[in-house]
């Protein structure tokens, strides 16, 4: 009898990778030997107790800090020494970088402003009408994709906190990121807003990679494909949520006891 192998689903491609990442501050090592692979069309969570090094890792990946050792690769290109503005143009975008939510502009105008750079209009004084029509069309499409069409003419300052976060994500998406980094996107939200943002992140990740720091473990369990747990600047555990949540080391790190 001939053995027939059953094809397995192809592993999503790695779009952002770190190897041996370390960051020293004087005699203190904040991040040590971190290896990380972020895959296209997946949501990857970076979790851990306070002081675990999550924000430092984000700052290293987005080049706001230079690593003391290790390498970072984006879409196959070494970006270890690349400045943050160039990294953003290459497709690695962190939400606060584009916090172009101007409170006195309308929702639509906020998105139009954010879209000017990727559409080549940021530094053009005279613009053909066709270019503006294209810009407006892209802005309307982007608002529709995040569910903000009804609020298109609302002034940003009048939006609820949750809707402002949606608008912030929309302005970030205007740069067409290949990898989107979100730093605690659910912070300060009520449950209704949390559900909306979680579903938006799930949709966004269908066409790009998402790496997020998040303390809401219910959200992590619901939408994340892969979880990396940090403790004292080192990787403690990784895998899917079910795997890491059962790890006694993770329980100890979060709860102080393996029996928690």
Which residue stretches match the model-derived regions?
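Glycine-rich phosphate-binding loops of nucleotide-dependent enzymes
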Residues: 2-260
């Amino acid at each position: 009898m001939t053995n027939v192998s059953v094809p397995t689903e192809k592993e999503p491609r790695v779009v952002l990778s770190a190897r041996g990442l370390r960051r020293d501050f004087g005699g203190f090592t904040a991040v040590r030997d971190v290896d990380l692979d972020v895959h296209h069309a997946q949501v990857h969570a970076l979790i851990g107790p306070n002081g675990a090094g999550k924000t430092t890792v984000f700052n290293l990946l987005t080049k706001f800090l230079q690593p003391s050792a290790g390498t970072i690769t984006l879409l196959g290109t070494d970006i270890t020494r690349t400045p943050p503005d160039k990294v953003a143009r290459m497709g690695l975008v962190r939400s606060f970088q584009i916090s172009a939510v101007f409170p006195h502009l309308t929702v639509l105008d906020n998105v139009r402003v954010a879209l000017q750079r990727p559409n080549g209009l940021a530094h053009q004084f005279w613009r053909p009408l066709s270019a503006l029509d294209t810009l407006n069309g892209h802005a309307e499409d982007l608002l529709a994709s995040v569910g903000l069409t009804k609020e298109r003419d609302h002034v940003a300052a009048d939006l609820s906190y949750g809707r402002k976060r949606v608008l912030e994500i929309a302005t970030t998406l205007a740069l067409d990121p290949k990898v989107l980094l979100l730093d605690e996107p659910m912070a300060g939200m009520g449950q209704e807003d949390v559900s909306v943002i979680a579903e938006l992140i799930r949709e966004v990740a269908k066409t790009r990679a998402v790496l997020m720091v998040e303390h809401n473990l219910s959200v992590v369990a619901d939408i994340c494909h892969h979880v990396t747990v940090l403790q004292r600047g080192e990787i403690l555990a990784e895998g899917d949520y079910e795997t890491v949540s059962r790890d006694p080391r993770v329980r100890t790190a979060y709860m102080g006891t393996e029996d928690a």
